[in-house]
């Protein structure tokens, strides 16, 4: 658990939610990973800011200060669980796509990693329980670029009023 998160949560007087633990693990993973993309200098997410920071720091800021609004503004009663479900589903889909050539559809239904990334993670979110970051770390260690894609997806969802044109969102989500 990062010192920053510990201080923030103690200041609020709340026990860490499963999603708070997940965010801490995810941001620690990104900060401590040698992937070149995580060290890139990017504009700091903040209105009218001219500062540049490393991607890993900016991701952490957007995780807490920007993207949460996607779920909060939609009126989810438990927006932490909705946010966590998005992560679980996103990484499960990325895992399925990465494994489709080596794992049959039948075997995929029984796949232990997929079960932990998606089914078990969804159940744990509903029960307000956190059992760790191991499966996410295993996937992201092999595919750190998934974080870059996730960053792009969240930014597009946040910036775009998707009621107007689904085609625009689709074009913005195409891979680099």
For every predicted segment, state its role.
Residues 1-176:
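Flexible coil/loop and intrinsically disordered segments
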